[in-house]
């Protein structure tokens, strides 16, 4: 399925139904009073998250969503039916903005979360409500309310436990393919991965966590070079960052520092997230390779997705980080301060 992480749609809540102008007409009641019923309320527009959705692709094909209109009131004080609500399903991690003002309306991160986006118009009141001692036969009703309309911008930020970050050809796609059932495109040239991929890693005792393979970052990604700016936002919601550098890349310490620098330029709070340094492709590592400590407090693991070297230790470390209750606290605190 094609991955789409932004979309714009137009929603229209239903108008209310008209109030009825009617008078009671029965045998032996020649001068019955007003009995016009109220119109029904217009349908609301709701957004609801669905954890099974991972893309905004559907909104590229359908951009207009209309709720039902309330039916009109009738005589004998009969109230019209409310218009049908419409529920639009979106992936978890969807940020919803007013397209006109850019104001964030909702940030939907929990499965099955439901948010009212546009209110239906109220039903007009029938003439039964307007009789007075001096106006016993009102020949008018209250006009119905209009349903709210809104243009919405959706931005999807993937919900994953671990985000794999690295330069093109660092081995991210190969790693996620051997750790999970994900099957991203893999080839020996840069930018094979053009969209993020999600994989579920099965751990011992029926535990599991989600890993996201983010398309390769290059130097200058925070300024829009390569594919970086388009996809860096997908690591904002991850709990743990796994920073990958290839053993055959030359200066792995410089590459690691460059990756951290690009993330800091995009959002300095990302560096508050717990991270793991991973040296990949150890099966083709130079014989004289010396793996540095990179930085204090960061676990460094050397792995090979081809031979399986270090993968068990990597899964263990990822699980420890993901299951830590305070794993994302510093990052969230800083985001709230901003």
Swiss-Prot record:
InterPro entries per the UniProt record, alphabetical: G_OBG, GTP-bd, GTP-bd_Obg/CgtA, GTP1-OBG_CS, GTP1_OBG_dom, GTP1_OBG_dom_sf, OBG_GTPase, P-loop_NTPase
GO biological process, one term: ribosome biogenesis
Sequence positions that bind Mg(2+): 173, 193
The OBG-type G domain, residue ranges: 160-323
The protein's Enzyme Commission number: 3.6.5.-
Region of interest called Disordered, as start-end residue ranges on this chain: 121-145
Binding positions (GTP): 166-173, 191-195, 213-216, 280-283, 304-306
A GO CC term assigned to this protein in UniProt: cytoplasm
Keywords from the named record: Cytoplasm, GTP-binding, Hydrolase, Magnesium, Metal-binding, Nucleotide-binding
Top-level taxon: Bacteria
Keyword flag RNA-binding: no
Occurrences of domain Obg (ranges): 1-159
Subcellular location: Cytoplasm
Named cofactor requirement(s): Mg(2+)
Listed GO MF terms: GTP binding; GTPase activity; magnesium ion binding
Family: Belongs to the TRAFAC class OBG-HflX-like GTPase superfamily. OBG GTPase family.
NCBIfam families xrefs: Obg_CgtA (TIGR02729), PRK12297.1 (NF008955), PRK12299.1 (NF008956)
UniProt subunit comment: Monomer.
Function: An essential GTPase which binds GTP, GDP and possibly (p)ppGpp with moderate affinity, with high nucleotide exchange rates and a fairly low GTP hydrolysis rate. Plays a role in control of the cell cycle, stress response, ribosome biogenesis and in those bacteria that undergo differentiation, in morphogenesis control.
Protein name as annotated: GTPase Obg
Native species: Chlorobium limicola (strain DSM 245 / NBRC 103803 / 6330)
Lineage: Bacteria, Pseudomonadati, Chlorobiota, Chlorobiia, Chlorobiales
